[in-house]
Design a protein with these regions (language model features):
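Hydrophobic faces of well-ordered beta-strands that scaffold small-molecule active sites
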Residues: 4-6, 37-42, 78-80, 103-105, ...
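Gly/Pro-rich active-site loop or hairpin
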Residues: 114, 144-258, 272-281
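Charged helix-capping and loop-helix junction motifs
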Residues: 18-25, 56-64, 86-93, 117-122, ...
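Active-site acidic/histidine proton-transfer and metal-coordination neighborhood
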Residues: 29-32, 36, 46-183
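Glycine-rich, proline-tolerant flexible connector loops at the mouths of alpha/beta enzymes
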Residues: 5-29
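Catalytic domains of carbohydrate-active enzymes, especially glycoside hydrolases
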Residues: 1-10, 69-76
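C-terminal helical cap(s) of enzyme catalytic domains, especially alpha/beta-barrels
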Residues: 274-298
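Active-site beta-loop-alpha junctions enriched in small/polar residues
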Residues: 7-9, 42-45, 83, 108-112, ...
Length: 299
């Protein structure tokens, strides 16, 4: 592993103003493991209060503090959580320049290119055309099939085979989890007819969190792509079960991408109750697979 990506809100007590003791421990860990701090994943809790959303000034002020913290941690990039409003970009540019900090919105399955706030961000990104404003691509938008670990988790909680079969067929036909909805926003008849229990409905609402976009959606965005999350649901002997990383790495190589790709393991959330979690084994296998693919592609 060459670098590390962290979520300070979850992993560093007191964020965005951790104690000196916490910062000293961070410095010690970085020195001890010899790993480069790469990117901080930051959130913007616009719904922090019950009775109102944050003002534009409050949003910008919070992100300024996140930029300062990421700089202190030795990073030069922050990931903006999906749906971050585009209005924060221009006011933050002077701070990005001061701290040499890139900002990159995460394009995440379920919140990707078809969402208006994502479209607004991309439009503002292109308007400003700054080397400090870009994107993080989450490869959950490139699922060739639904994660099997999610299906098995739902089965363990009582989901029947019929709803799962409907969604699997959608993928076979070139669709994805979003295809379970009709134009009216309701479940398509084929799925609605087989939802017979609470566990079936639970599965259906999980199913829309994965997309099956073509890699060509990135063609005109490559100059703005700063970082990529290589989503990991389940490693098999032949690679990741849902995502074709050989194909993705070849695409990135052919388009001269030179940023990091980061293993992001999410199979742990689908661990069946009573079964051991295999996060270390899964991440190690994924990292090895990525390196093997790169050796083959790069020669």
């Amino acid at each position: 592993v060459d670098g590390v990506e962290i979520l300070p809100d979850q992993m560093m007590h007191g964020t965005p103003h951790p104690s000196e003791e916490t910062l000293a421990e961070w410095d010690r860990l970085c020195r001890g493991y010899g790993i480069k701090p790469v990117i901080a994943d930051v959130f913007l809790n616009t719904n922090l209060y019950d009775n109102r959303t944050l003002t534009k000034k409050e949003c910008v002020s919070l992100l300024i503090e996140e930029i300062k913290l990421a700089h202190r941690l030795g990073m030069n990039m922050i990931r903006l959580v999906s749906m971050t409003p585009a209005f924060v970009l221009e006011p933050l540019l002077p701070y990005c320049e001061k701290y040499d900090m890139k900002m990159a919105l995460e394009i995440h399955a379920g919140l990707s290119f078809d969402k208006q706030k994502t479209k607004d961000y991309i439009a503002e990104m292109k308007r400003l055309h700054s080397p400090y404003i870009g994107l993080v691509i989450d490869t959950g938008i490139f699922c060739k099939r639904e994660p099997r670990v999610m299906e098995n988790y739902c089965r363990a909680l009582g989901t029947g085979e019929e709803p799962i079969a409907v969604v699997q067929k959608l993928y076979e036909q070139g669709g994805d989890g979003r295809s379970i909805y009709g134009e009216d926003g309701a479940f398509i008849p084929a799925l609605a007819a087989v939802l017979k229990s609470g566990a079936d409905h639970m599965y259906a609402h999980f199913a829309d969190g994965y997309e099956n976009e073509p890699l060509s959606v990135l063609d005109d965005l490559m100059p703005y792509i700063f970082h990529i999350h290589f989503k990991l649901f389940e490693m098999t002997e032949n690679g990741e079960y849902s995502v074709d990383y050989q194909e993705i790495l070849k695409y990135l190589h052919d388009h001269d991408y030179d940023g990091y790709v980061a293993t992001e393991y999410e199979g742990n959330r689908w661990t069946i109750p009573g079964q051991p979690m295999a996060e270390k084994e899964q991440v190690i296998a994924h990292q090895k697979y990525i390196r093997d693919c790169l050796k083959e592609i790069q020669g």
